[in-house]
Amino acid sequence: METAVQHLINHGIRPSVQRVAIMHYLMEHFTHPTVDTIYRDLLPEIPTLSRTTVYNTLQLLQEHNAVWALSIDKRNVHYDGNLKPHAHFLCRECGQVFDIEIDDHLKSHLHSYPGVKVEKVELNYFGLCPNCKAKQVESQN
């Protein structure tokens, strides 16, 4: 598995303490965090970290295709360190964003356009996550 430092270098980004910590966080947390979530979680580890540094680092990572910025939620931008083909699901009740695997047929279709290089595909599903669906069923009974 590629380390955060290797990932940064492979995408042409000079590693720094903050960049490595943010990239490592995204590689370890598949929760599609926002700037505020990353800032809150890393602040105890890096007391000098600022929200602006997190935002600017994420912008840099996105510009170098080291992470994806998801505009699945109208209120927040979520960040994804998983660059393998997959879809996303947004729960309309709790706001949780999680990965959904896509089948091999769709994956093979992504590479079937001659002369183009597909760099990113956004496939988003919206609805209720299992927890919110269960709560809805309980409230109806």
Segments (PLM) and residue ranges:
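Non-DNA-binding regulatory cores of transcription-related proteins
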Residues: 63-141
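Short, Lys/Arg-enriched N-terminal segment that forms or immediately precedes the first helix
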Residues: 1-12
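Short helix-coil-helix linker/hinge
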Residues: 15-17
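Pre-recognition alpha-helix immediately N-terminal to the DNA-recognition helix
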Residues: 20-25
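Basic amphipathic alpha-helical segments that dock to polyanions
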Residues: 54-64
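Short capping segments at the starts of secondary-structure elements
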Residues: 29-34
